């Protein structure tokens, strides 16, 4: 079944209840272009998340260099928390894309937009570490 651009953005608006969902890649001319745009945005968000996670680990190591055990404990806690957060993000995005047929463009677009949004929220938290 082919989903029109209008259907995808209507679906995303209802699912995400966010202006962000309709703004991201909304100027693309076709369903395929919307998908490619959200895929690109997702990759950028994933790269930014990974870079900030690495930077947070470096800040912790630097801030706690006088106490290696404390630094190791903090880093271990961050690693475990990040793993849990990734599970949360993936589950939340699965919920948000649930009504679209799995494997469809609409499902992939909804998932990509969700990942971008939630990654941006996580970036803000990671930038504050160490607290």
Model-derived features with residue positions:
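N-terminal signal peptide c-region/cleavage motif recognized by signal peptidases
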Residues: 14-18
């Amino acid at each position: 079944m082919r989903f029109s651009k209008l259907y995808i953005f209507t679906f995303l608006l209802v699912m995400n209840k966010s202006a962000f969902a309709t703004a991201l890649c909304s100027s693309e001319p076709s369903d395929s272009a919307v998908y490619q745009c959200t895929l690109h945005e997702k990759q950028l968000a994933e790269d930014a998340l990974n870079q900030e996670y690495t930077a947070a680990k470096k800040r912790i190591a630097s801030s706690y260099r006088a106490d290696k055990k404390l630094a190791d404990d903090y880093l271990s806690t961050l690693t475990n928390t990040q793993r849990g957060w990734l599970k949360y993000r993936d589950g939340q995005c699965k919920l948000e894309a649930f009504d679209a047929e799995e494997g469809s463009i609409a499902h992939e677009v909804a998932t990509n937009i969700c990942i971008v949004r939630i990654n941006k929220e996580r970036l803000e938290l990671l930038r504050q570490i160490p607290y």
